[in-house]
A protein has these predicted regions:
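Flexible, low-complexity linker and terminal segments
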Residues: 1-166
Length: 166
């Protein structure tokens, strides 16, 4: 690689990711620092550049959604109740779903493996249900996050914060 042409702060036009320069590669030497820079690597405190970079970083994260698998609904794709979980609630919600179905209830569930960005089909999945019950082992931060992105849905929270599983 010709180091005079290598621009480590330029971004790929499709993914907005910066170019990869494995450490020690001849011709790709450069400095990395925590201060914001322009696309050519010059330190910048310019307000317009800062705004552009903030928007560019947000867009980079949003574009990751194209590579995130769609949510898979366990159960009917529409109905009264959708149980929602993420992280360590997977097994507990699966068991609750099975027990509710054994009791004759119709219930569906989804488990989020990706939360920022959310899977592309999240809004479509949610639109099929009257109530969305978000089960969390915290104070309901994920439910709050979902409400900010999709405020049109009816969310209920099932939270447990005693340091124990459901």
């Amino acid at each position: 690689a010709d180091g005079s042409k290598f621009r480590p702060f330029e971004r790929d036009s499709e993914t907005l990711a910066r170019k990869w320069a494995p450490a020690g590669t001849p011709g790709l030497e450069h400095r990395v620092g925590g201060l914001e820079k322009t696309h050519i690597g010059v330190l910048s405190t310019d307000a317009a550049n800062h705004e552009m970079m903030v928007k560019e970083r947000a867009e980079k994260v949003a574009r990751v959604a194209a590579d995130i698998p769609d949510l898979v609904v366990d159960g009917p794709e529409s109905g009264d109740v959708l149980l929602v979980g993420w992280g360590g609630t997977y097994g507990h919600i699966l068991t609750a779903t099975e027990e509710l179905r054994a009791a004759g209830k119709t219930v569906s569930r989804v488990h989020f493996d990706f939360i920022d960005p959310l899977p592309k089909n999240t809004e479509k999945v949610f639109s099929g249900f009257r109530k969305i019950i978000v089960c969390e082992l915290n104070l309901g931060q994920f439910a709050g996050y979902l409400k900010t992105i999709f405020p049109q849905f009816n969310y209920l929270s099932c939270n447990k914060v005693h340091g124990q599983t459901f």
